[in-house]
Amino acid sequence: MDATQATRAVVEEMASVMEENRRLLTKLDSEIGDGDHGNNMNRGFKAALERLDTADPSTPADVLKAVSMALISKVGGAAGPLYGTAFLRASTALGDREEISAEDAAEVIEAALGGIKQRGKAEVGDKTIVDALQPAAEAAKEAAGEGNVVGVFRAAAAAAEEGAESTVPLRARKGRASYLGARSEGHQDPGATSTYLLLDAAARTLEGGS
């Protein structure tokens, strides 16, 4: 499997995971938000698969750009622009590369983080996607030195899981959840959770295909 096929396989698994966890994400979002995160992410990744069926991508970046366009056009709320920007920045970071090194993989995650932070103006501790994605990017960068793409995503996913769990006691400072004040405490952030699930899907897919 070449890098383009592998990237597509990752997106297919991400779509499957978003469908499988739709109710979980909806439950988490119902506690502190609009309750639509699960359905929105599921719809967005289904649209991404449809776009890939017609786009015929020739590089990993083409795959990521197609996902970006689908998420921006199909996912409502804050998640669409945020995740759409993340995938677009990841695509730009890869350029026209046909193969992906461990360093490239870490750069992709770092680029996604940069896009989300710029778009959402959030930092660690605000109870958002960033609480999962920033530690993931840091872990990915550290793991890249071992030269193993799977290891990069495995480290990123593990750090993102811890980051998502760390949002439980936090008081939300961004988005709709911030309107709840102290009532947002005691709940895991749905965006941080979906970030972990997406990175875990990538790690498992690449591990299975390596």
Predicted regions and their residues:
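N-terminal loops that bind phosphate or other acidic moieties
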Residues: 1-210
